[in-house]
């Protein structure tokens, strides 16, 4: 199942203003909400709520404003709290719906001096550390399973099965050809990402392999030459980490999806 919860650090401004409204006894009548909206215009420009006022859909109308700042019940979960919640509910974590923001292999952290230290951590601690580093996540969305469900969902590029994976582009994936970093023939991004450092440069041979993805052919069919196999493995694992593709891992069973 797909499960979404609020995250605490990116919503710090909401909780500050919620406490502010509670102290003033601000209610949910139309005049009170209008006065609240007008008062928010006086917020300091560096207030933690300002990025959400600019970007979050919750603040585009008075009803959304009231729901965000005056809702009596709201629970946010850090990564460790979310994973503990899953365990207590008899659920098992599968993957983040958009995982790149949680991975030290992706974005600015990939070239950080701390990347090797992060990679030494167990996976769950890695996610928690990257959440703290980014500091502005407003929600966590994950694919989860019942704890007793068969564990057939872990994707692995370390064995011999990956050449049989069928890559499928995600609908928010786009190829960009403007303002490229040195040596790149294109950059692939996922439009649903909110962090601007999460993009994957492609060299010309990688771009050719990426453009061959059609949702029908396996990696081995896209990169049939032996010399292409290792570069293809690196590329397609990177595309998966960066939320650019998913895989049909059952091509021998009729490639069902």
Q: What is each residue range found by the language model?
A:
Residues 3-7:
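Acidic carboxylate diad motif detector
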Residues 176-207:
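Short alpha-helical segments that sit at the start of domains
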Residues 104-145, 195-257:
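Long, charge-rich, low-complexity alpha-helical segments
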Residues 10:
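Phosphate-handling architecture centered on phosphoinositide signaling
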Residues 94-184:
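Hydrophobic packing positions characteristic
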Residues 1, 16, 20-113:
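Substrate-binding/catalytic lobe of Class I Rossmann-like enzymes that use SAM or dcSAM, i.e.
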